[in-house]
Amino acid sequence: MRILHINGYTDEERCDKIPEIYQNIHESMYQLVQHMAILGLQYQSIASRKCAEYILSLGDQAPEYINEDYCDHILTLWNDIGIRSCFERSNEFPLLDSTKYFLDNFERISDPDYIPSTEDILHSRKITTGIHQITFKVKVPRAMGGGVQEFRMYDVGGQRDQRNKWIQVFEGIQAVLFLISCGDFDQSLREDSRQNRLQEALNLFRSVWQNRFLASAGFIVFLNKRDVMERKIRAGKHIVDYFPDFEDFCNSPQEGNYFDESDWTKRFIQQKLIDITHETFKRNSRNNIDYSRRECYYHFTVATDTSCVRKVFNDVHQMILHQNIKQMGLL
C-alpha cells in the first residue's frame, strides 16, 4: 500500500530496512543449519561444516556488522548440496518464504554500497506485534463517484498471542482485508507444530467473519503466495496429503477431462472460504444484525506484484461506495 499510495520509500527509509533484511538472511541460514542434523542430512565438505559451526556460534540474531568472512560463510553454505537438500524439505520446519530470494541475491545484498530495491523490501519480513495504522488518500474513479477517499488501515499481528488486541480496532471498520497464504498448505505453525497453517487461517477467518463487531463490514480475502503454491505443486507437493477432502472435491463434476492441479487447489481453498461464509451460527440474543448480505471478494495474489494489489483496491472502492450509498438510504 505504501508503494502504491504513499510515494514509496526514500533512500534513507530503504537503508533503514537493511538490518531487517540481514536478519531475514541470517535467520534463514540459521534455521537451515539447525535442521541439517535433525533431518539426518550431511554437508558436502568439511569447509561447509565449519561454516555451519560458525553460523550456529552466532545464535539466531544477525551480527551487528556484516564482514567479508560472514559473507563467505553464507555463500559457501548456500552452495552446499546438503543445505539445498535441507531447503527442499523446508515444509517440515519453520522457514521464511523469502529464504531462496535473499540467498540467491546475497552477493548483491552483501555489497558495502547496497541499497534495498523495492522488491527486496517486499520480500522482507518482520513479525507484526501490536497494531500499526497507516493513513493515505486515493482518488476515487469517476465511475464510482469521483473525489478522494481517505483510508485508515490497521496492520495487526497475526500470531495467536496478538489476536486479543484486534478488538480495539474492530468497531466502525468498513472493510476487512484478510490475508491467507495459500502456499502454506503443507506447513505447520511456529507456535504449534501440530496445527496446519492453512487450517489455522481458515479457522481464524471463521472467527473474524462471525465477529459481531464486523457484522456490517465487507471482506476482501487475499489468497496470497499463489506463486509459492504453484511452485510446490510442480515440485510434487499435494494438498490432498494435508486436506484429504480434496479428493472428494476433485471428484465433483468437471468441465472437460483436463485436470490442472494448481487450478483445482485454488478452487478448493476458495470453496472452503465460501462454505464458511454460508455457515449458520448462533448469534447473541441481543444482536439483531443481519449477517447474510455482506460482500466477500476473493483474489489470488503474489505479494510482490503491486499490479495485483492495485486491482484488488478497486474492490475496496466498490465495497465502501456501496456501504456509503446504503447509509444514505439510496439502496
Regions found by a protein language model. Give the residues of each.
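Active-site neighborhood of phospho(di)ester-bond hydrolases with catalytic His/Asp-centered motifs
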Residues: 222
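Hydrophobic "lid"/C-terminal helical patch
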Residues: 316
